[in-house]
């Protein structure tokens, strides 16, 4: 059968990684197996990706590495958009406005203005009270549950095997003697997985309110020192609008709370009053645990017994959709560098 590759995890990072293996490194899909406890369509607090608001925003840190992951993802998502069949796949472009109660720094601003389509700095005279800086641009929006399912279906149809399996130790991901490489894309699970148990991994809890508001087709975000308010329309979702949110470090609670729902609705309708031009129809309230990591994402190759290779790719926190393609590209490059795979990188 030849050497086999296992991708451990089927959240957005695992799916991006599998896509990169095929389309950036030229690996044969039939030699790739995705192994995961949770698969697209599942709902669990420990399966973060379906709960995401789902857009490219300025939530990520301003270090050079993460900014590069963001840039790569933003500029290359059109490839996935095209291969998956256009906007119906759960990925589309929409206008976005972002405000900060503080200046986000030259490093972030100078990076963003290089590549964001339709990038404009909003004049101070047009900023809401208390806002220090604002920009507008055209972004990518995800319908996260739909996009995950379509990505998995796309890969499966190209002969990638997808297996539901709960593992307690990363060594179990080496399914056969032919499994030579494992990509560890376990997200929050990296905190407990035997052989990994990364003490730097922690949850950043969020709560969102999903409403029916087809008249809202723009993103609007406001970033404070200790809060985040965001309004994110889901493409091809029959008018779903995600309202958020919270960034609660080290909070493992998967429950939702009415007082947080009230706070989210208050903040988002103040930020974009026209949400209330139509009666507010709440579809669902959900909480998710962003897979954060002290020091940022771990993208690292680890040579194991008998020359087997584990490549870690996790810790994307709340920016997996917008930085994950770049992260996965970098992780796959580690395979190319270590195994000298014939590749297009």
Swiss-Prot record:
PANTHER family: D-AMINO ACID OXIDASE, D-ASPARTATE OXIDASE. InterPro entries: DAO (IPR023209), FAD-dep_OxRdtase (IPR006076). (R)-lactate binds at residues 230, 290. The gene is DAO1. This is D-amino-acid oxidase. Belongs to the DAMOX/DASOX family. FAD binds at residues 10, 13, 49, 53, 55, 290, 317, 320-322. The keyword DNA-binding does not apply. One of its GO terms (biological process) is nitrogen utilization. Optimum pH is 8.4. One of its GO terms (cellular component) is peroxisomal matrix. It comes from the Eukaryota. GO terms for molecular function: D-amino-acid oxidase activity; FAD binding.
């Amino acid at each position: 059968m030849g050497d086999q590759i296992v991708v451990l995890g089927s959240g957005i990072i695992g799916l991006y990684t599998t896509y990169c293996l095929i389309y950036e490194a030229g690996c044969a899909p039939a030699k790739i197996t995705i192994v995961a406890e949770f698969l697209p369509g599942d709902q669990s607090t420990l399966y973060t990706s379906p709960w995401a608001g789902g857009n490219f925003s300025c939530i990520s840190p301003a270090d050079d590495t993460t900014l590069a992951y963001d840039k790569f993802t933003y500029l290359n998502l059109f490839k996935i958009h095209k291969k998956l069949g256009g906007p119906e796949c759960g990925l589309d472009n929409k206008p976005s406005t972002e405000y900060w109660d503080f200046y986000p720094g030259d490093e972030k601003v100078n990076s963003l203005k290089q590549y964001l389509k339709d990038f404009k700095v909003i004049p101070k005279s047009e900023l809401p009270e208390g806002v220090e800086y604002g920009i507008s641009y055209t972004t990518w929006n995800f319908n996260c549950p739909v996009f995950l399912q379509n990505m998995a279906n796309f890969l499966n149809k190209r002969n990638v095997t997808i297996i539901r399996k709960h593992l307690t130790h990363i060594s179990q991901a080496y399914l056969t003697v032919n499994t030579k490489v494992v990509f560890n894309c376990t997200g929050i699970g990296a905190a407990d997985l035997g052989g990994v148990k990364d003490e730097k991994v922690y949850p950043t809890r969020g709560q969102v309110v999903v409403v029916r508001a087809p008249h809202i087709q723009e993103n609007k975000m406001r970033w404070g020192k200790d809060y985040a308010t965001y309004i994110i329309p889901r493409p091809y979702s029959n008018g779903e609008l995600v309202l958020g949110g919270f960034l609660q470090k080290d909070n493992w609670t998967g429950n939702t709370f009415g007082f947080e729902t009230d706070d989210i609705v208050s903040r988002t309708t103040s930020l974009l009053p026209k949400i209330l031009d139509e009666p507010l129809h709440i579809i669902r309230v959900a909480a998710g645990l962003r897979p954060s990591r002290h020091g940022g994402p771990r993208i690292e190759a680890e040579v194991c017994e008998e020359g087997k290779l584990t490549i870690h790719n996790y810790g994307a926190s709340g920016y997996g959709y917008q930085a994950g393609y770049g992260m996965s590209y970098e992780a796959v490059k580690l395979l190319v560098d270590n195994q000298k795979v014939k590749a297009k990188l």
